[in-house]
Amino acid sequence: MLDPKFLRNELAVTAERLATRGFILDVAHLTQLEEKRKSLQVATEELQASRNAISKSIGQAKARGEDVDAIMAQVGDLGAQLDAKKVELAAVLEEVNAIAMSMPNLPDESAPIGADETENVEIRRWGTPRSFDFPVKDHIDLGEGLNGLDFKSAVKITGSRFIVMKGQIARLNRALGQFMLDLHTTEHGYTEAYVPLLVNEASLLGTGQLPKFGEDLFHTKPATEEGQGLSLIPTAEVPLTNLVRDSIVDEDELPIKLTAHTACFRSEAGSYGKDTRGLIRQHQFDKVELVQLVKPEDSMAALEALTGHAETVLQRLGLPYRTVILCTGDMGFGSSKTYDIEVWLPGQNTYREISSCSNMKDFQARRMQARYRVKADNKPALLHTLNGSGLAVGRTLVAILENYQNADGSVTIPEALRPYMGGLTQIG
């Protein structure tokens, strides 16, 4: 959520910056609502003051032995008017809040202006794509040939966009998650967390999935002791970031760096017909998530560091990649600045996203009321939140199968993963 004061005082600037994201803010309507809010606020305060003043005169009139029926009637009339104005004011505030909750974050000035992914800007590459002297297979053919990827059984059990993994490929998938967690906790300073895969509405509102992106989620029917429905997490960003919702942490505790390896669930409502084969776009997938909670002045440096942590995974695995900065029209709803890391996939002969690292600044923190106590004045201030994939496990598995394939259909295991595979050097 944007700063309400900035929104009121810099409405034209806000509209201009949001327009670079493709979000058209109805300035005239919002201005009208703000004027109505001010008018109702003044009217409410005046009615309240009048009623209070007249109410005090009742006791004085009684002490003088005067009839107070007329005064009582006047107080009752003012009370009815006050209640009516409060209802009007609440309706206006609710509409203003709904508009505010629908607004995406303001893009950072360093984010390139553009309409879509074609205007993202590549900032660096690492590694050289391998040259093959045999016909390249994609991960589907490789995985099925090794009896490790079973799409048919997944369709029978559940439906499309799910997978059953078996044997050494299932083991390799597990090894990847463990390797990523170990790297981030032992070398990058993150604390591992085990979090729920089901979250409540308040959590999804806090990180910005609701109210706008409800159709992208899987929802349960009310089934808890509290009688509320829950939603499967689309990313561990949701539970990890919400750990500080409605909290004030000490400045000395910052930065807070958290990581979790979880299953993630997405309906892919807007992706009909895209990546219908294989592991690239699944309803259920594993991901190691990185979250940082920092002071505002540290968040841009933290974004660079977090992106580097995700890149290190690919470097240790020897997987070529490129990093791009997203233009304003391609950024996620809550992001102020985002780097996408794209890994090289020989089976598709292109780079594909494997991590998205974002600085949300105070956008999520304001929705969650996640704050820290500033030592200098002992007052609470909003945190800045950051998140990124470190990495998407399934897509990393795809990259390993395709980049490390051999002519006979076997797959060489990257050296960094061999300790997690019992010393195994090859699958198949």
UniProtKB/Swiss-Prot annotation:
A molecular function (GO) term: ATP binding
Binding site for ATP: R266, S267, E268, E353, I354, S355, S356
Keyword annotations: Aminoacyl-tRNA synthetase, ATP-binding, Cytoplasm, Ligase, Nucleotide-binding, Protein biosynthesis
Keyword Nucleotide-binding tagged: yes
Subcellular location: Cytoplasm
A GO cellular component annotation in the UniProt record: cytoplasm
Catalytic function, reaction form: tRNA(Ser) + L-serine + ATP = L-seryl-tRNA(Ser) + AMP + diphosphate + H(+); tRNA(Sec) + L-serine + ATP = L-seryl-tRNA(Sec) + AMP + diphosphate + H(+)
Protein residues bound to L-serine: T235, A236, E237, E289, S389
UniProt pathway: Aminoacyl-tRNA biosynthesis; selenocysteinyl-tRNA(Sec) biosynthesis; L-seryl-tRNA(Sec) from L-serine and tRNA(Sec): step 1/1
PROSITE patterns: AA_TRNA_LIGASE_II
Record text about domains: Consists of two distinct domains, a catalytic core and a N-terminal extension that is involved in tRNA binding.
Record-stated family: Belongs to the class-II aminoacyl-tRNA synthetase family. Type-1 seryl-tRNA synthetase subfamily.
Assembly: Homodimer. The tRNA molecule binds across the dimer.
HAMAP family from the UniProt entry: Ser_tRNA_synth_type1
Described function: Catalyzes the attachment of serine to tRNA(Ser). Is also able to aminoacylate tRNA(Sec) with serine, to form the misacylated tRNA L-seryl-tRNA(Sec), which will be further converted into selenocysteinyl-tRNA(Sec).
Protein name (record): Serine--tRNA ligase
Source organism (scientific name): Shewanella sp. (strain ANA-3)
